[in-house]
């Protein structure tokens, strides 16, 4: 609630005017039964057509004024609700960007998408309804009861009995459904997660004929959500019929008492109609209030889930160093580094130590799950080490400002991720003010110039989201160009040439080595041929260093490297 008020504080005027105009509308509405009563008792009773016309015009005037107030209130409420949701969505997105990969992995992508979309939309709807109805409905209920007392005290006692009973029903159902709505939202998260995973891996699903398995898993989760929603719906569904029963019994009692008092000459027919209208107003407003409370319950549950994301703070503290002053320091140094991912049992990396000089090319090789990507992901500080220290240019990576550190490092990840826009726009992610000349130089290094120049739009050629309109090799070359255009001190190629043929891969490595002020290069690859000419090769095996050395040294004394190399060059082994 505090966070919602924080965002609404920028809309104080709207938060005052929205309920104010709604209460003005309610005030005019409370006079309608009195006007109708006057028409019946005076106009119809005395057959006074002029009076009837005059009072009918008054009814129309009250309706027009009420409508104007309602529209004005809706405008202010919508402005405040949309503004609140917009501010919350912006700050939530900004907060998500500040989280480290550890927190992102823990929360989950589908959960964050739900918080950003449906949860914030639910809060927006709740705020809108609260501003319009939270004061109006109680005002009508108690106002109608007071007006009833001004007409006849004994008949109005029916209201005194009915309203507390209705309040017990409404608030009892609200309290019982609130925790259930949290479970419903959790079920929706699960559905979204399954859907996202299926759509992301749809090609794999179909390649292995796993459609039926996916359908079965989705059906199970969907049915669980269905049963839960039905249960919540049954409880919430009791509200309207129970309130109708109480109100209808009250109306019957009111008409019976009214009839007795009309016969006694204490009440007029118009006054009985007015009492009936006030009871109807109470019924309508209590139903609105009941639905409002259900929506408030949903909104508060969603707001609590959003607050849970806001309460998660990044485990990665920002440093203050922007540049190293030690020109003699090693480019990269790992000292007894270990890494355990959050929630994982075993360490992904254990006691890793090595030193890399500036300008060296380092190969990283190992079996599947050996920790190759984990190792290079520590250099730009995507994750923090569990133990040990990492130094870049003699400065601990934790002491760098994260932005400054990542400016020094260019990384090409395993998955070639491009964004909707032109080729020029995508490469400028690496350097926002890169000229076309710099972009073409980067494409030359990445071996991508040829295919770009063949396109009609060249650098202005459009790239679909994710680069779906490009081949795997084209996507990889563009992501490499994006990394090298900034001319980083350290360049990491994390198995990012897997879609390239050997000739293109070799030309790429040659171009990088020939760059002016060539970067310190880390190449992660499954191909031994891609790493043979590296200054040193780090061989990983189940998170441990199995060997460090040149290709020739490792081929002599590292069994893990021998196994990898000879599995790819069998003829040489046989010879």
Where in the sequence are the language-model features?
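An intracellular "coupling" helix at the cytosolic face of ABC transporter transmembrane type-1 domains
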Residues: 9-13, 98-102, 118-131, 135, ...
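Transmembrane helices of ABC transporter permease
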Residues: 10, 14-27, 62, 129-184, ...
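Helix-loop-helix
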Residues: 48-54, 147-161, 231-305, 309-310
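Pre-NBD coupling/linker segments of ABC/ABC-like ATPases
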Residues: 314-327
